[in-house]
Amino acid sequence: MRQAALRTWTILGRVLGVVCLVAIVLSGAVPAEAAESGPFGWPLRPRPTVERRFDKPERNWLPGHRGVDLAGSAGQTVLAAGDGIVVFAGEVAGKPVVSIDHPGGLRTTYEPVTAKVAVGSRVVRGTAIGTLVAGHEGCPAAVCLHWGARRESGAHNRREYVDPLGLLHEVPVRLKPLEP
């Protein structure tokens, strides 16, 4: 009898813990200090919805999605995700783009963004770098920011596309089964 009661309380405690964890995850609550820590942050505020995720191509010339699409609104201010130097502010294939070089061979790109900064400008995380405009095709939202990142490494200046969400150092919550 006593063993059955103990088992019931153990199961009830686990269920309650999972329910609380799920409620926290679904609320999207992130402590302010966690949201603002680390060298990189979100390029849009408030924290945007990720409409399309990173899909690394097998080779740089093959199909894939070399960044993430973040839901925004036309005219919204776009922020530098981290400290760096603006290396490009202009048009690529008719789309306005801003690119920033960061320490360690990292470059982030923001598109379609009308620049408020000039090439050579030093920026810090959170600096307004431009204004989001409509026109990013392939995004399910009416207006999206395409945020990309790539790293140059090695003696041959090899370029590797990386998931910009990985720069945020947010640890995703993963629920594990109670029983193996």
Where are these regions (language model features)?
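Acidic, glycine-rich catalytic/binding loops that coordinate metals and/or anionic ligands
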Residues: 2-6, 35-49, 71, 118-125, ...
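Bacterial N-terminal signal peptides
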Residues: 15-27
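C-terminal region of N-terminal signal peptides and the immediate post-cleavage residues
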Residues: 24-37
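Short glycine/threonine/proline-enriched tight-turn/helix- or strand-capping micro-motif at secondary-structure
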Residues: 49-80
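Short, acidic/hydrophobic/Gly-rich beta-strand patch recurrent on exposed beta strands
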Residues: 68-70, 97-103, 148
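Short, well-structured beta-strand-loop connectors
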Residues: 77-87, 117-134
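Zn2+-dependent peptidoglycan hydrolase active-site motif and core
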Residues: 81-116
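Flexible, gly/ser-rich surface segments that form the specificity/activation loops bordering the active-site cleft
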Residues: 87-91, 96, 127-145, 153
